[in-house]
């Protein structure tokens, strides 16, 4: 009887060892996949950053050379009444919840905005965000069905078109985006950034640049 029991225990131990080995293989495979996706995301970010910085520089040049910009896409000059009204917020989350605080921090920023401005219209990218707001009976103005993990220019244009149409109609006075900023491979943080209207303070730097004398024409005005 003792021998039978010992054999059973030995077999159970071997089974557990094999199970641990299989789990380790799966974990290593998941790690390799995650590392590959992280490198791709980093490369995509590095490729798009020059375009972002160039656009930021052009907007800064406009503010530096045009003191009184009369456009609905620019914040009113100092001394004029501030913009009041409904906000629009583009909330970008992942499709899955296995991402640590990645999604929770974005949701926390979105809930903070809703606490401050309850009439904010939500535009949501990512299954995690859609599920959270639906589960908590928080209305969404629009939820985009494609994944945030596979962004394309076409999808970005579709989002921009919907937001700009609402902005031009006067459905909301300001557009914000809540997203995760990748500081390095180990650190990321949620940010809330206003997209429209542009504000002079957002583009002020200590860098001295050559003045531009060519007049600007805004289309649409």
Regions found by a protein language model. Name each.
Residues 5-221:
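C-terminal beta-strand-loop-alpha-helix "lid" module of Rossmann-like NAD(P)-dependent dehydrogenases
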